[in-house]
Amino acid sequence: MARAAFIVCLLMACAWSSHAVMFKLSPNTQKCLKEDIQANQLVMGEYEVSDVPGQIIDYIARDTKGHILSQKEHITKGKFSFMSEVYETYEICFISKVPAHQRGVVQEVSLLTKKGVETKSYEGIGEASKLKPLEVDLKRLEDLSDSIVRDFVLMRKREEEMRDTNEKTNSRVLFFSIFSMCCLLGLATWQVLYLRRYFKAKKLIE
C-alpha cells in the first residue's frame, strides 16, 4: 500500500515537472536550446529578459529543417506556443542585437517550457466537467501514464531502428572485407602467374 502511494506521488510530481533555465547572453551573440520532442505535442513557454536600453533580443523557435514555428522581435517578457509536427529536435534561440556605436552589456534570459501533459490545465478541465479533486488527479495520472507509455514505445522503436542500422552496417562491412580479401588473393595470384611467365621467358626458370 505504501509503495503504491509512493508511486502515485511520484507520478504526480512528474506530471507537474517543467523545464526552467536561466542564462546570460553576451552582446551580439545567440544561444540556442535544443530538445527532442514527439510528434503532435503542444509546447508552451514563458520568457523574460533583463532590460537594457538600446539593446534588443529576438527569439525564434524552429525545427532542424529551418521551419519557423514561433518568432518575435524585441522581446522583454511574454509567452509562446507551437505544435510539433513530427518527432525530431527542435530549438529555441535567443539573439542579442546591439548597435555598433553602443557598448554592449550582458543580459539575463530566463525560460520556462512545458510540453505534452504539462501544458494541460487540469483545474479548468475539472471545473468544466464538474469532477472531484480526486477524479482530476486520476485524470492527470492517466494522461501521464499514457505519455510515459508512448515514450517507452518510441524509445523501443528507435532502439529497433538503431539495431537494424547496426546489423546492416555490420553486414556491409563483412561483405566489403570478404570482397577486399578476394581482390587481394586474385591480385596475388595474377602477380605469381605473371612473374612465372616472365622468368620462363627470360629462361631463368624451367
UniProtKB/Swiss-Prot annotation:
Residues 21-172 are lumenal. It is found in: Membrane. One of its GO terms (molecular function) is cargo receptor activity. Keywords: Developmental protein, Membrane, Signal, Transmembrane, Transmembrane helix. InterPro entries: Emp24-like, GOLD_dom. The chain crosses the membrane at residues 173-193. GO terms for biological process: dorsal/ventral pattern formation; endoplasmic reticulum to Golgi vesicle-mediated transport. It is a single-pass type I membrane protein. Eca and bai are essential, though not redundant, for dorsoventral patterning of the embryo. Specifically required during early embryogenesis for the activity of maternal tkv, while the zygotic tkv is not affected. Belongs to the EMP24/GP25L family. This is Transmembrane emp24 domain-containing protein bai. It comes from Drosophila simulans. The lineage of its organism: Eukaryota, Metazoa, Ecdysozoa, Arthropoda, Hexapoda.
